[in-house]
Amino acid sequence: MNRTARYATFVVLAHAAVVFWHLVLVAKITPGLTEHQVLAATTAINLVPTVALVLLWTHFLRLGGFLLFLPLAVGLIIGGSEHFVTPGPLNVFYMATTPWLLPFRVTAVLLLVLEVSGCWIAIQAFRRVPFLQAEAKQ
């Protein structure tokens, strides 16, 4: 079995679950997101990483690594800025005390860890020679 694909699968599935829960919490903290918008955003955020998983499992490591890296890096930059750097209603350090504060902080940190891990896995996948090319040379 492909170890890179296994690790990527864990990260992408965990990321999908945490993104959904995080967006539900965002909707509770800052009203404005409907249930349909949360579901649509979750689907959109996780579509490209899911395609990347299929590519990684079918031994297209470079393309799969690129498609895994791109959305996770964008999420890392935007989420890291929104939740840890820029002051605002969704910054974990400046949020008002609500019953959702601790779960929101936990999901923000989990997303940070999963996105960094996913980017690292994607870079490792991108640096490897795809299995199909290695078999063709033999």
Predicted regions and their residues:
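Membrane-helix interface segments
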Residues: 60-64
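Core segments of alpha-helical transmembrane spans in multipass integral membrane proteins
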Residues: 13-17, 36-59, 70-73, 77
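Individual transmembrane alpha-helices with interfacial aromatic-anchor signatures
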Residues: 96-117
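C-terminal TM-helix exit segments that contain a strictly Trp-centered aromatic cap at the helix terminus
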Residues: 18-29, 71-89
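Membrane-interface interhelical loops and short amphipathic "cap" helices
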Residues: 20-38, 89-100
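Core segments of transmembrane alpha-helices
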Residues: 44-51, 111-119
